[in-house]
A protein has these predicted regions:
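Helix-turn-helix
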Residues: 6, 10, 14-47, 51
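Hydrophobic/aromatic residues within well-ordered alpha-helical segments
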Residues: 45, 52, 56, 60, ...
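Hydrophobic alpha-helical connector segments
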Residues: 51, 62-88, 143-147
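Amphipathic alpha-helical packing segments from all-alpha helical-bundle domains
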Residues: 65, 103-132, 141-145
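C-terminal peripheral helix-coil segments that are non-catalytic and often amphipathic
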Residues: 73-84, 120-128, 156-183
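Amphipathic alpha-helical segments used for helix-helix packing
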Residues: 84-106
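Hydrophobic/aromatic-rich alpha-helical bundle segments in the mid-to-C-terminal region
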Residues: 93, 112, 130-176
Length: 183
C-alpha cells in the first residue's frame, strides 16, 4: 500500500507541474520503481490520474468545509489550504483551467457540484448576516460573487507575483471586503 501512495503523490506533483504531459516513467523514477510496477496498482495513467483527482477532491472539500459557520473562517480556510502548498494550487489551476481530455465528465461535474454547494453555503451566511442587520441587505448574490472573486484573485496573484508575505494581502483584502459589505 505504501508504494501505491507514493505513486499517487508523485502523479499529483507531476500533474501540478506538467499537466497531463507527465509520464509514468517519470512517476516510476520518482518512486524508485520500474514503470511496469505501476500497473500492479493502476490499470492506466488515466485511472491513476482519476484516483489522484478524486482523492484531492475529497481532501479539499473535507478540509474547507470544516469551517462553514463564518465568512471570515471560510475566506481564510480556502486561502490557507492553498497557501500551505503551492503544488495544490497549481494542481487545481491545471485541473479547472486545462482539464485533461481523458478525465471523465463526471469528475468535473462533481467539482462543479461541490463548488456550487460551497457557493450556496456562503450565500446563506450572507443572507443570515443581512437578516441580523450586520451587513447590507438585498446584495447577497453580488456579495457572494465578490467573495469568491477575491479568493480566486488572491490565489492567482500568488502564482503570478509570488508575494513575500501573502498573508498580509489576505488581511488587507478581507478587511476591505468586510468594510464594503457591513452596515
Amino acid at each position: 500500500m505504501e508504494t501505491r501512495k507514493k505513486i499517487m503523490n508523485s502523479a499529483f506533483e507531476l500533474f501540478a507541474k506538467k499537466g497531463i504531459s507527465f509520464s509514468l516513467t517519470e512517476v516510476a523514477s520518482e518512486v524508485g520503481i520500474k514503470k511496469a510496477s505501476i500497473y500492479a496498482h493502476f490499470q492506466s495513467k488515466e485511472m491513476l490520474l482519476k484516483e489522484v483527482i478524486d482523492k484531492e477532491l475529497k481532501e479539499y472539500f473535507f478540509e474547507i468545509n470544516q469551517e462553514n459557520d463564518n465568512l471570515e473562517k471560510i475566506f481564510y480556510g480556502v486561502l490557507d489550504y492553498y497557501n500551505n502548498s503551492q503544488t495544490k494550487l497549481l494542481f487545481w489551476k491545471r485541473l479547472l483551467l486545462l482539464p485533461p481530455e481523458a478525465i471523465e465528465d463526471s469528475i468535473l461535474d462533481k467539482v462543479h457540484k461541490l463548488s456550487e454547494d460551497r457557493f450556496q453555503i456562503v450565500k446563506e451566511l450572507i443572507v443570515s448576516e443581512s437578516k441580523k442587520g450586520r451587513i447590507k441587505i438585498n446584495c447577497d448574490e453580488a456579495f457572494c460573487l465578490m467573495f469568491f472573486s477575491l479568493i480566486h484573485g488572491l490565489l492567482s496573484s500568488e502564482l503570478i507575483y509570488h508575494p513575500y508575505n501573502i498573508r498580509e494581502h489576505y488581511d488587507i483584502i478581507w478587511n476591505q471586503f468586510w468594510l464594503s459589505i457591513k452596515k
